[in-house]
């Protein structure tokens, strides 16, 4: 079996396992993750926070985004611009979002695009199905974040 086939099977198994989590367990885990992120010095001192907007059972990033906005942080979230790339756009509220490619909430066209890859004092929050002990991630298979991370200069 090829590596790509193994990844595909692992993605399927992880998505099924994630669906089995009960709402109360998910809420507790989401709150803990949000609290942990907000306590990180890199997050507290970053000029720009680059989170993903959660969907379909992912770790809920909306409370994290809300707290960052309340703290006066610059928050920019991704928008898919074609079949393989994304750009980050500044948002001020969740009203700045609309359904985009793949049915995921993305910034409206009116939101300012920033050079997120070149933003050295920034923190990128990356979606994943899992990470291994060495920090390697398994995403959803489209490669958007893999391509972005290659040129990213922040944390």
Predicted regions: what they are:
Residues 2-120:
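N-terminal active-site beta-alpha-beta segment that forms phosphate/nucleotide-binding
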Residues 107-111, 127, 151:
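Mid-sequence acidic-hydrophobic segments that form the walls
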